[in-house]
């Protein structure tokens, strides 16, 4: 049973999507005015792993990642560079997509851009005005926060504390200091669109509400982003969207932790701002992915030269194990009597696979899941050092375990990109043959152990007098 930590309720909850076999997920994309940095990489690799795991356990995932391609920051940067805002944003859209490809992040199903959804945003704002949650001024349109009863629930912020001065935009035309902009009246020289509220452009928060509703509906399963977005961005999204539809909007809110550099927050002013483009020249993308999963996605992670060296060494060790398996398969045998070494590795493989899924089912806990990966690595190394002729079935099973890990974590691509079929079935047939031999020897205790072990791996076997022993895949 999959459980996820919901920022909204501050606890782990059983994951139940609105549609049984489909997950609708929206992850806030970048404001495209600069290069993709390490913090972005951590967020999108984390949600890539979450998406991969959901797909691995049988869900169809509909993922939307937006581009904020018009914003105060884009306008300011375009003026500094002497470029058109559209030209600037398109440049960094391409930078982002290239960086995600470098990091082996699977593409989203849809990448909507704000500038291509102005009519939907205007319609969204009109309905909020109609329902009494928003009001027009000469400067644009504002959402009246006091009209929304549960404001602050996601970020655990008290409205009175907010009014006293925390991260709000001042304006003489606001009814209340905490109200936020849905539409901004155009200033001279800025990009603008016609609207019932006058020429202008959307505010930041309304974009995601309008675009997510268009592609995922008025209710969906997962909304994600960096922890820094929980307030004010995600808090304001909730207020707008629930006010708009009158329905609960998102069931599960997931947020990634911050990336530190040598114990300090990453920033240009400190000179420790690291772009994906630059770091990819120094480290293989798989090393970066492996670095990110060393910490739980909700926890902060500290980038240091020492930590990267440690990560690189550990990843190389796993690659060496996979290579040793490949080489050892050439001298392995398909059948034979198992001794203590075979049964020990079999138990390690069975237990580690179980523990891996247990960890991933506990809010995608990659830290605990990695322990299982190292247990298998150590177990395989020890086994190969003790036997002259290894069991083909066991080696195939170990190989398949690393293939599963690679598919979920986006690793080991060099070994598995040409092999798309699992070795499970061959291993199951091998164990069934071994079990039959044990039953002939009246070693029922060990044959029952194999039967029970196969069930834990997701296979049910039946002894048929006419057809012999047959097996079928079951859900575990």
UniProtKB/Swiss-Prot annotation:
Motif location ('HIGH' region)? Answer: 30-40
A GO molecular-function descriptor = ATP binding
- The enzyme's E.C. designation: 6.1.1.16
Amino acids binding Zn(2+): 28, 208, 233, 237
The catalytic activity, as recorded, is:
tRNA(Cys) + L-cysteine + ATP = L-cysteinyl-tRNA(Cys) + AMP + diphosphate
* Cellular component per GO, a single term: cytoplasm
Keyword flag ATP-binding: yes
What is the main EC category here? ligase
**Cofactor names:** Zn(2+)
Please provide the Gene Ontology terms (biological process) for this protein: cysteinyl-tRNA aminoacylation
Question: What does the UniProt keyword field contain?
Answer: Aminoacyl-tRNA synthetase, ATP-binding, Cytoplasm, Ligase, Metal-binding, Nucleotide-binding, Protein biosynthesis, Zinc
UniProt-annotated location(s): Cytoplasm
Q: Which CDD domains match?
A: CysRS_core (cd00672)
- Record-annotated residues binding ATP? 268
Q: Which SMART domains match?
A: DALR_2
Motif 'KMSKS' region extends across 265-269
Q: Which HAMAP family match?
A: Cys_tRNA_synth (MF_00041)
Please give the family membership noted in the entry: Belongs to the class-I aminoacyl-tRNA synthetase family.
Name of the protein in its database record: Cysteine--tRNA ligase
- What is the native source organism of this protein? Methanococcus maripaludis (strain C7 / ATCC BAA-1331)
Question: What's the name of its gene?
Answer: cysS
């Amino acid at each position: 049973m999959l459980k996820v930590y919901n920022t909204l309720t501050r606890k782990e909850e059983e994951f139940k999507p609105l549609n049984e076999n489909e997950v609708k997920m929206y992850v806030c994309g970048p404001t495209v005015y600069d290069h993709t940095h390490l913090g972005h990489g951590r967020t999108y690799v984390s949600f890539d792993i979450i998406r991969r795991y959901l797909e691995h356990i049988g869900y169809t995932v509909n993922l939307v990642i937006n581009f904020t391609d018009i914003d105060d920051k884009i306008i300011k940067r375009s003026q500094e560079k002497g470029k058109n805002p559209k030209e600037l944003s398109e440049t960094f859209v391409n930078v982002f997509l290239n960086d995600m490809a470098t990091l082996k992040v699977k593409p989203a199903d849809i990448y909507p851009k704000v500038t291509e959804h102005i009519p939907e945003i205007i319609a969204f704002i009109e309905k909020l005005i109609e329902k009494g949650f928003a009001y027009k001024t000469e400067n644009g349109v504002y959402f009246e926060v006091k009209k929304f009863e549960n404001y602050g629930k996601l970020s655990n912020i008290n409205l009175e504390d907010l009014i006293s001065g925390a991260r709000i935009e001042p304006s003489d035309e606001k009814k209340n200091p905490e109200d936020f902009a849905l539409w901004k009246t155009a200033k001279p020289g800025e990009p603008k669109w016609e609207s019932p509220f006058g020429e202008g452009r959307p505010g930041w928060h309304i974009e995601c509400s309008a675009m997510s509703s268009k592609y995922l509906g008025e209710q969906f399963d997962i909304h994600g982003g960096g922890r820094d977005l929980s307030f004010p961005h995600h808090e304001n999204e909730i207020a707008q969207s629930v006010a708009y539809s009158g329905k609960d909007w998102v069931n599960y809110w997931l947020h990634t932790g911050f990336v530190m550099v040598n114990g300090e927050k990453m920033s240009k002013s400190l000179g420790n701002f690291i772009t994906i483009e630059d770091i990819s020249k120094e480290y293989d993308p798989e090393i970066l992915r492996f670095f990110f999963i060393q910490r739980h996605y909700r926890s902060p992670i500290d980038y240091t030269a020492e930590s990267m060296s440690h990560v690189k060494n550990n990843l190389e060790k796993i690659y060496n194990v996979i290579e040793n398996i490949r080489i050892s398969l050439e001298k392995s045998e398909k059948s034979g009597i198992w001794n203590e070494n075979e049964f020990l590795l079999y138990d390690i493989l069975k237990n580690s696979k179980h523990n891996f899924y247990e960890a991933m089912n506990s809010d995608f806990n990659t830290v605990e899941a990695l322990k299982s990966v190292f247990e298998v690595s150590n177990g395989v190394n020890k086994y190969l050092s003790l036997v002259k002729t290894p069991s083909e079935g066991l080696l195939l099973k170990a190989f398949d375990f690393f293939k599963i890990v690679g598919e979920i974590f986006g690793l080991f691509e060099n070994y598995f990109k040409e092999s798309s079929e699992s070795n499970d079935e061959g291993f199951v047939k091998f164990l069934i043959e071994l079990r039959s031999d044990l039953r002939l020897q009246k070693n029922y205790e060990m044959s029952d152990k194999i039967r029970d072990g196969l069930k834990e791996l997701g296979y049910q076997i039946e002894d048929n007098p006419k057809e012999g022993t047959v097996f079928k895949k079951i859900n575990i």
